[in-house]
């Protein structure tokens, strides 16, 4: 049952915590308005804030409703966990991004996220933040707490020691070392456990980590730009590589990017501009078609300590040597250049996600692209449609005669300035 009411004035009500009247509720977790404090026999519908509202309209409290048999705010707090986890985007591989909040009497008393591999997990930071207030509180965490000793102690034991009353989990950990054992340990300790709250949101955030755990391969996405008549374009849209642009965010999100050797002079400019991750850039993977090209690529670029790392792949017949050149560029020699071997290299380096960027000389990457489709190694496609009509027939996607029809699932689109961005899954 849903009961709605007209906006009402609330100047005479003194809440337990300050009310942020204009900003979004998510702007400051310690200032979340606790509606429970307004409960009275005459106003029982104040139990739950309608989550379609982004905040409060000053000076009135907007649409309220009561929902039967729904626990207050589980989804809201799990979305907060996801927001926290994404603060470490691009920094955690081979670990997942995880966020945690501790809630007591309707207030967030602690929060944390996993910043990078080897550092404490989200639950530890959140429990430290909450201190003694964690006792009898509810812990929300986007991924099942670990139950083993690795580089850090088990998070299950930290939650048990803190005497939390309840744990709400976004998704079960696909890591076979953890899988459901964390849930079992918490239940055995007498803690109430709820699983699969905002599960799809939590899964999407860590699709690279999940794919790596289930398949032993990094998550691989294909990106390209095209004209409105279906020709590949050797550029990205205006502002796409600037801070906040979709391409800059992609470079922040993915652990490695495969590029055409024709872009070798532009490598220093192919980097994420996102402020929170400006010093951590994806590994740039270049495929050299011959020994001369391999030598030029390895010797002509100096890798800065804080800049993108460059790895050149070359075939054995090119008579190159594996190793790192004086300029800091790594050379990897393979029996034969193929996508599967490159992905194995990325997996062994602890990478969760790889972006195949179809720019520059597409012929450089056609073998890898064909491998991706024929061996079903591609999971996602990202297409930027630019407002242009091209007359270059040789760059028509249809010219790739080996390419078979593919069904794209969960296709989404959004307009970015004059371009349209399409994203979907194979």
Curated annotation (Swiss-Prot):
Its EC number is 3.5.4.26. One of its GO terms (molecular function) is diaminohydroxyphosphoribosylaminopyrimidine deaminase activity. Residues 1-61 form a transit peptide. It catalyses: 2,5-diamino-6-hydroxy-4-(5-phosphoribosylamino)-pyrimidine + H2O + H(+) = 5-amino-6-(5-phospho-D-ribosylamino)uracil + NH4(+). Binds 1 zinc ion. Gene3D superfamilies: Cytidine Deaminase, domain 2, Dihydrofolate Reductase, subunit A. Disulfide bonds: none annotated. It is an enzyme of class 3 (hydrolase). Residues 72-194 form the CMP/dCMP-type deaminase domain. One of its GO terms (cellular component) is chloroplast. Monofunctional pyrimidine deaminase involved in the riboflavin biosynthesis pathway. Also has a reductase domain that lacks catalytically essential substrate-binding residues. PANTHER family: CYTOSINE DEAMINASE FAMILY MEMBER, RIBOFLAVIN BIOSYNTHESIS PROTEIN PYRD, CHLOROPLASTIC. The N-terminal domain (64-250) is required for the deaminase activity. This is Riboflavin biosynthesis protein PYRD, chloroplastic. The gene is PYRD.
């Amino acid at each position: 049952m849903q009961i709605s009411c007209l906006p009402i004035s609330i100047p005479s009500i003194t809440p337990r915590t300050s009310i942020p009247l204009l900003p979004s509720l998510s702007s400051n977790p310690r200032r979340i308005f606790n509606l429970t404090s307004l409960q009275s026999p005459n106003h029982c519908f104040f139990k739950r804030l309608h989550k379609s509202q982004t905040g409060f309209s000053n000076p009135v409290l907007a649409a309220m409703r009561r929902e039967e048999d729904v626990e207050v705010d589980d989804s809201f707090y799990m979305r907060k966990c996801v927001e926290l986890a994404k603060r470490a985007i691009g920094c955690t591989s081979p670990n997942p991004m995880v966020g945690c909040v501790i809630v007591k009497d309707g207030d967030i008393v602690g929060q944390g996220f996993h910043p990078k591999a080897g550092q404490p997990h989200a639950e530890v930071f959140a429990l430290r933040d909450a201190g003694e207030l964690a006792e009898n509180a509810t812990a929300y965490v986007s991924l099942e707490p670990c139950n083993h000793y690795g580089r850090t102690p088990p998070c299950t034991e930290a939650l048990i020691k803190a005497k939390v009353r309840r744990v709400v989990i976004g998704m079960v950990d696909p890591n076979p070392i953890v899988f459901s054992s964390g849930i079992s340990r918490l239940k055995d300790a007498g803690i109430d456990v709820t699983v699969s709250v905002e599960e799809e949101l939590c899964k999407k955030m860590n699709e690279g980590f999940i794919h790596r755990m289930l398949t032993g391969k990094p998550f691989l996405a294909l990106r390209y730009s095209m004209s409105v008549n279906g020709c590949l374009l050797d550029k990205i849209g205006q502002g796409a590589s600037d801070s906040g642009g979709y391409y800059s965010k992609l470079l922040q999100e993915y652990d490695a990017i495969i590029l055409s050797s024709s872009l070798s002079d532009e490598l220093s400019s192919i980097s994420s501009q996102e402020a929170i991750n400006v010093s951590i850039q994806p590994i740039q993977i270049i495929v050299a078609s011959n020994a001369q090209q391999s030598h030029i690529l390895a010797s002509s670029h100096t890798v800065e300590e804080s800049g993108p790392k460059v790895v050149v792949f070359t075939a054995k017949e090119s008579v190159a040597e594996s190793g790192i050149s004086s300029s800091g560029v790594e050379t990897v020699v393979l029996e034969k250049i193929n996508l599967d071997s490159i992905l194995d290299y990325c997996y062994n380096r602890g990478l969760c996600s790889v972006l195949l960027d179809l720019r520059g000389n597409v012929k450089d990457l056609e073998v890898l692209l064909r491998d991706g489709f024929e061996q079903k190694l591609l999971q996602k496609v990202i297409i930027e449609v630019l407002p242009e009509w091209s007359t270059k027939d040789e760059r028509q996607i249809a010219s790739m005669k080996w390419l078979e029809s593919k069904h794209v699932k969960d296709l989404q689109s959004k307009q970015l300035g004059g371009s349209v961005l399409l994203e979907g899954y194979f």
